[in-house]
Structure formats: structure tokens, C-alpha cells
Amino acid sequence: MSHPPIQTATLSWNEQGTPVSEQFGDIYFSNEDGLEETHYVFLKGNGFPERFALHPRDNCVFAETGFGTGLNFLTLWRDFAQFRQLHPAAKLQRLHYISFEKYPLQVADLAAAHQRWPELACFAEQLRAQWPLPLAGCHRILLAEGAITLDLWFGDVNTLLPQLDSSLNNQVDAWFLDGFAPAKNPDMWNDVLFNAMARMARPGGTFATFTAAGFVRRGLQQAGFDVAKIKGFGQKREMLTGILPQRLNTQSEPWYHRPLATRCDDIAIIGGGIVSALTALALLRRSAKVTLYCADALPAQGASGNRQGALYPLLNGKNDALEIFFTSAFTFARRQYSQLLEQGIRFDHQWCGVSQLAFDEKSRGKINKMLQTDWPPQLAAAMSREQLSALAGLDCAHDGIHYPAGGWLCPSDLTTALMALAQQLGMTCHYGHELCQLERVDGLWQLIFTSPQVNRQHTTVVLATGHRLPEWQQTQHLPLSAVRGQVSHIPTTPVLSQLRQVLCYDGYLTPVNPANQHHCIGASYQRGDVTTDFRADEQQENRDRLLRCLPDVSWPQQVDISDNQARCGVRCAIRDHLPMVGAVPDYSATLAQYQDLPRKIQHGEDIPLAPVWPELFMVGALGSRGLCSAPLVAEILAAQMFGEPQPLDTTTLAALNPNRFWIRKLLKGRPVQQRVSVLS
């Protein structure tokens, strides 16, 4: 999916104090009463708030064209909050709101517009606090303690709609067909939009729009909606509403199919790291029943147990799935970690910024490639040596790229706190449970443990065991590698304590953690090695990398490794550096079912859905980027298991599918060589 730069909205204000789009020459809402217009046209036009009480599911999905000032969303949120307060035991507990916006407003303009509606102030303030950077693609925002999911898709709706994942098909309960008037914004109002609305709507899904233009009515009818004209708001004579009478058949690539979990009331998670904890929380937020089994006596004893880890996006300037995923993952992670802190979840951290140095020609070439993209300066910006040094507090010796929203946090603290939070929310934990075997018996998964020697059974299982993922018979063919990494703990000095930012070079160095007066410097990279003993040569290599990359300044000589303080963990890595998240693919069945796949596609044969192990899911291959990727992959997995809309486009989701390496070869008619993952 191509992600062109996003231009923010340019506003003026008319005599009535209503914001006007300079791009479209049209007002954002009625001069008479924007709030009443929203309530009449979009909520009442779709049968809300009365439909809340009649909704048959626990989640109601809305979609909108033109987020604008967020007035429609804020009004709906207010009405839903009132409904929940009056009907706490109702079936409906969550809202999912999907909106497309080509020219997002800046926060200051949002704040100015929101002053018109003091009754929405508490909701508007929360929205502005989470307002995303102007980056193309989807920004998932969790509000109201997870009861409301807002997916803001920035970009041209006609470009975005064809690239949406099939998880949005037959999902939308109500469409708010907003945006500027057809005469002012003719490019939006076309058959691409109308057909996508029908494809995404559930049977019985509705729409409402302020316009009664004939070509809009005809386009929606042709797409499959039953359309009616009703009295318009205020001085407008007519508006349109409608309903989709029957489900529309939709198509997607069957080889990247993402099956949901048939039941979510008995889920076992195997693992004890950060992605296990975040997956548990994402499932619990959806009212799942979760039991976690961890081989260790405490959480965060593996790769998630480090004292400090850097958080920053992985950019490459290629606008490919890797960059799109990690840009989305980073911004989602920062929002989620900040929300956790606001909730009182404590973990050592500093949002101090991260500087990536151009320490040699190769790294300079990579950074120059990254900077060819017109990034918002709040995400990434080119900096000279002098600028980076002023920010870092020490001479950085090189120019480079600066990530102002990055920083460091303590993975061990965070994981432990998240596990405790999950238990408070109802998760059952069993530590000291060493899983040795998974067996499918009578429609259930049998979990066979060696320590203690007990068997458990669950309907659904999520494997989140890091580098141990390939140990099970169902996952042994996944192309994963174990990579040992030793992080050195360095006592601070008066000079080193001046470092105010994380420095990344051919390694990384963190600022001092005030809690222990140490820095972290790392990390070694030993593929295929799962031992975690201290090694003096790796300790020395961590120091030497810093000295090699910054040879012209003296302060790195202050790094003292003589006390041999370090921690070693084992990462789960993969060749393309992207996580694996989704249903566990059935290796043998995939090869048998997709033999001669190109010919079958060419001849138009029916292609069956990708074979997977039933009710068995996984999340892994986070490598050394788990702090960045774990929150989003946990959200992706939970959304898949519950059959909800995904926060990424089709191409990027396919690049995360655990079967992707096999499918790519099969689509080219090439053989898939059987291999067992590198464990030791």
C-alpha cells in the first residue's frame, strides 16, 4: 500500500464562527447548529441512540467519510456514554468508529472548533490528547478505557477503500456519509465509495447523509441499498437514508485468510513476556476469558526482562510493508504506553528522544534514504552534529536522524505491571508451567506440562513463547531463528550522566536510569545460540562498538565494563524483520492444498482458504523491536480472534501472516523446502 504525504487542513472562520475548509471552500458543519445537525442527520437518520438498546452484539461498528472536527464522533460518544450509564447490563458494551479524512485538522484548530460545544468538552479533550500525527494510513485510538475504538484513516478515501482488509467486509452497522457537499468535493462522491459502503455494511446496516443529490441516490441504490428521502435538517428540504437489505458476497485472497476464533470464553496464552501480557489485555478488553501459562516462576524472565529498551520507529525510506507497519506500531505504542501511565501503571521510562547516528558511509546512506520521505518533524527529522549534540548533552560526533517522540522504558517493569493489571481484570495465571506438548483431542487443545506434571485443556490457544515458538509440532516449520543478545549495564559517571537521549549507532546507549544509576549498552547478536551465560568477549564487544562508531570524541572512554554487570536474553528473529501474528498455518496441508497454485489462479479455479490449525494462534518474531511492535500485534491478534476490523491495510497484514514465506513461493510456482527453525 502506497502512503503519500498527508497535508493538514487549512481553515478560515466565517462571520458565524464556523470553520471553513480552504481546500474545499465549504463549511465543516451547519452555521445554524452543528450539534443539532449531527444529531438529526447522522444519529437519528440511522436510528440512534434508540438502536443502542436493540443491538444484538456487544460491539457496534460505525463508518464515516470525512472526520473533520470530529463532531459526529463526539456526539455519538456522548450519547453512547449516556446509554451505558443508564443501561450498564445491556448487550452492547463497545463502539468501533472508522473514519476517513484526507486533510486532518491540526490540534489547535480542533481545539478552536470544539469551543463551540462545551457539552462535549470532556470527550473532545480526550480525543485531542490522542490526536495522531499527519501520517497516511490507519491510526487506532483506544478511548473510554477501551470501550471505544477509533480508527482514523488519513488519506484519500478512494485510494484507501480498495486497499482495506477483508476484515471490514460485512461489518458496518451504520454509515455516516458526510464530507463536503458533492458540488464542493466531487471526487469523493462516486461508485468506488458507494460500492465500498455496501461491501462493508452488514445485512440491515444503514446509512444517512445530508445530501439528496440524484446521482448519490442512484449510486447507492445501484450498490445495493434501499434508499429513502426524508426531511432535511433546518432549511434543507431533503436528505437520504437507507438500509442494506441483504449480505453482499465479497472476495479476498484466500491464501492470506485470517480466521477468527469460534469461541473466546476459554483462551490459553502460553508465554510470559510483554507480548503475552499485551495480548491478554487486548483480549480482556473484549471480555474474553483468559488463562496464562508461563514456564518461569515470574514474568519477564526472557527477552522482555531487560532494564532499558529503546523505543523508536524502524524507517527505511522504501514505503514498504516494513516501514508502514513500524510507523503505525510506533505511534500506537506511544499512545498505549502513555495511556497506561495515566492509568497509574508504573514503569521506569523517559520520553527523551532517540538519535540515530550516521557513523559510516553505509549508515549515512540508510539515513539519507529514510529522509527522502517528507516525515512530520514530530516523528523524524534530519539533524546536524551540532543539533544532535545539543539535544543529547554530549558530542555525538556525527549528524543523523532524530526521533523526538522516542525514548526508553524498562521492559521488565512494564511486563510485570501489565501482568498484574491483566490479573486484576480477570486473567488467571499459572507460573512455573513448562509446556512440552500440544495435542488436538475431541475439538479441544490438550496442554501437557512437564513441570508440574499436569494436563490442561482449552478451546483456544495463543502461542507467545518467543524463541521457543518452533518447539511444538504445529510450529516447527516456521522460518524462525533464535538470537542471543547480551546487554551490558554500565555505572554512570559525571560525564555519562550528561547524556539526555538514547543514541543508536551500530549498537545503542541509553541515558542513566535514575532508579539504579546505570546505563544500558548493547547488544550482542549471536544467531542460533540460546544460552544465557555471561560472556566477557560480548561485554567487551558492546563497548568496542561504541568506541569504533565515535572515535573522534573522548567521552565514550568513560564506559566501564569491569564489574561484568550484564543481562542476556534470546530474541526470536526472522529474515524480513516483521512479526508473525495470526492463526498457526498447517505446513503440510498448505503445501498439499496449494500445489500448482499459479495455474489454478490463471484458470479461475476455486481456491480454498489457507489451512490452519483450528483454534491455534500465535504471535512472535518480534526480534529486538518488541517494545515497538508488541502493542499493535497484540491488538491485531485480538481483533482477528474476535472477527473485528483490522487497523492495517491488506498488503501490510499479508506481510505479517505466519504463512507468508510459503505462500510467496507457492504463488510463484516455486517449491517450498522443508526446514526446521534454528533453535540452537
Curated annotation (Swiss-Prot):
Q: State which Enzyme Commission number(s) the record gives.
A: 2.1.1.61, 1.5.-.-
InterPro entries (alphabetical): FAD-dep_OxRdtase, FAD/NAD-bd_sf, MnmC-like_methylTransf, SAM-dependent_MTases_sf, tRNA_MAMT_biosynth_bifunc_MnmC, tRNA_MNMC2, tRNA_S-uridine_synth_MnmC_C
Print the keywords alphabetically.
Cytoplasm, FAD, Flavoprotein, Methyltransferase, Multifunctional enzyme, Oxidoreductase, S-adenosyl-L-methionine, Transferase, tRNA processing
Similarity annotation = In the N-terminal section; belongs to the methyltransferase superfamily. tRNA (mnm(5)s(2)U34)-methyltransferase family. In the C-terminal section; belongs to the DAO family.
What is the protein named?
A: tRNA 5-methylaminomethyl-2-thiouridine biosynthesis bifunctional protein MnmC
Q: Output the Pfam families linked to this UniProt entry.
A: DAO, Methyltransf_30
Does the record carry Nuclease as a key word?
A: no
Its UniProt entry gives the catalysed reaction(s) as:
5-aminomethyl-2-thiouridine(34) in tRNA + S-adenosyl-L-methionine = 5-methylaminomethyl-2-thiouridine(34) in tRNA + S-adenosyl-L-homocysteine + H(+)
Q: Which GO cellular component term is one of those annotated?
A: cytoplasm
**Annotated segments matching region tRNA (mnm(5)s(2)U34)-methyltransferase:** 1-245
What this protein needs as a cofactor is:
FAD
**One GO molecular-function entry:** tRNA (5-methylaminomethyl-2-thiouridylate)(34)-methyltransferase activity
One biological process term in Gene Ontology: methylation
Q: Where is this region: FAD-dependent cmnm(5)s(2)U34 oxidoreductase?
A: 270-680
Where does this protein reside within or beyond the cell? Cytoplasm
This molecule's function is given as: Catalyzes the last two steps in the biosynthesis of 5-methylaminomethyl-2-thiouridine (mnm(5)s(2)U) at the wobble position (U34) in tRNA. Catalyzes the FAD-dependent demodification of cmnm(5)s(2)U34 to nm(5)s(2)U34, followed by the transfer of a methyl group from S-adenosyl-L-methionine to nm(5)s(2)U34, to form mnm(5)s(2)U34.
